[in-house]
UniProtKB/Swiss-Prot annotation:
GO cellular component, one term: nucleus
Coiled coil: none
Stored SUPFAM superfamilies: RNA-binding domain, RBD
Any one GO BP annotation for this protein: ribosome biogenesis
Record-linked InterPro entries: Nucleotide-bd_a/b_plait_sf, RBD_domain_sf, RRM_dom, RRT5_SRSF_SR
Pfam family, one: RRM_1
Name of the featured protein: Ribonucleoprotein 1
Superkingdom per UniProt: Eukaryota
UniProt cross-references to SMART domains, sorted A to Z: RRM
Species assigned in the record: Saccharomyces cerevisiae (strain ATCC 204508 / S288c)
Amino acid sequence: MLIEEIEFYNVNGKKTTTVVPENTKIKKRVLNDRRTLYVGNLPKNCRKQDLRDLFEPNYGKITINMLKKKPLKKPLKRFAFIEFQEGVNLKKVKEKMNGKIFMNEKIVIENILTKEEKSFEKNQKSNKKTAPDLKPLSTNTLYVKNIPMKSTNEDLAKIFGVDPKNINFVRRELVDLRTNKVFFSDEFHTGEAFIKFDNLGTGDSIQKKCREFKGRKASNGRVLLVKIASAKKNEQKQEGGDNTKIKQN
């Protein structure tokens, strides 16, 4: 059976350890947000008794939940959640003790989050992870991928029914081996292009055009991947990446 070592602090403020089986559930103590303050930037040699000596003479008996955090490649950070007795005005404690020099360190005192605030913060983080990265879309341009490498402006113009000058290929970036200079090819593209539609009528739209050309095939039978382009002036950066360039015709 796998085991893990858990750190605790005894009644004298000294660190002790115990060994518990893996997957053993350790009941977490629920903090009362109306009676608890966060105390941060504690000295590395701070112990529970030091905190009792700091707070109890003025605010009565306290309960200390000492924790420590050690970010990678950063100094050890020590902080604690201190729970006061009923009737203690946390606002006054914070006003008096926040920024106080304690064992040569300037401590930071903050209120802890309420259940509602924790729930809201958790939902916000979850939404940021799951929400799609919505971007404004163009009203007259399609972005097309999977284009045969030998395709020309005229080839795509024939498929999409636009003027060849409205076809902008994303050009390949090449390196001149003699000079090591980077340049953009006039001959080779990346298989991507922007198709601009002029004067879309009231009964037409770029969304309709996108649906119309979904699944359309090139002359060699390859299926073109079509979507609405992002509404950015420099669409090359949006769709083509850093190593490409749109060839303006």
